[in-house]
A protein has these predicted regions:
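Glycine- and small/polar-enriched repetitive beta-structure motifs of secreted/surface proteins
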Residues: 1-232
Length: 232
């Protein structure tokens, strides 16, 4: 077979089709080791089950991008979403365990429950809710926005934070910022800091360049260095 438009629906779905083309597939082993990629989609149970060789990907439920090889546009959406995707590229991911152990990083995003869950090997990151940057390893450019925000991110890089527990005990520091609620929430291994509202530099440890602006501003900062502060 030499591919072209494809669809397929159940059982072993695109059972080792060669050579790819437009793809879709829907149930059980959906893109069942399709070779050689092209525009993909896949929808249910083992969705992109070890699709080879990548291209535009999507996948939607159950094991979603289940060990996809070799990368491509990625997206994901539900259950295990980017489940152990190998080897990275475009990424996104949306619900429950989004970037569950994605390997090997690249452009990232992620949105819900355990967001960037233990993503391995970092790259451009973002993440928005749930456990946000849930123990991301190994860092790169970070952001993170709600709930546990940078939840114990490892290992640092450019950080930001924004809401709820924001830089929540981030490890190991680097360029920091953080904006609301628990802000620099006992950040660990400091570096350039900033922080802005609610508990601002809340007992930041271990310091470095500081700043802080509102509400509890330099809230009992520990341990010193360059400081500033403006509001309460």
């Amino acid at each position: 077979t030499t591919g072209t438009q494809n669809v397929a629906v159940g059982a072993n779905a695109l059972d080792a089709n060669t050579t790819g083309s437009e793809n879709t597939a829907v149930g059980y082993q959906t893109l069942g080791a399709n070779t050689t990629g092209d525009h993909c989609v896949a929808v249910g149970w083992q969705s992109l089950l070890r699709n080879t060789t990548g291209n535009s990907n999507v996948a939607v439920g159950s094991h979603s991008l289940d060990h996809n090889t070799t990368g491509g546009g990625n997206v994901g959406v539900g259950t295990h979403t980017l489940s152990g995707n190998t080897t990275g590229t475009g990424n996104t991911a949306v619900g429950q365990q989004p970037m569950l152990y994605n390997t090997t990083g690249n452009y990232n995003s992620a949105y819900g429950w355990t967001a960037l869950q233990d993503n391995t090997e970092g790259n451009y990151n973002t993440a928005l809710g749930g456990g946000a940057l849930a123990n991301n390893t190994t860092a790169d450019n970070n952001t993170a926005v709600g709930y546990n925000s940078l939840t114990a991110n490892t290992t640092g890089a450019y950080n930001v934070g924004v809401g709820v527990y924001s830089l929540d005990a981030n490890t190991t520091g680097q360029q920091n910022t953080a904006v609301g609620y628990d802000s620099l929430g006992a950040n660990t291994e400091g570096i350039y800091n900033t922080a802005m509202g609610t508990n601002a530099l809340r007992s930041n440890t271990t310091a470095n360049s500081n700043t802080a602006f509102g509400w509890s501003a330099l809230n009992a900062n520990t341990t010193g260095t360059s400081n500033t502060a403006v509001g309460r």
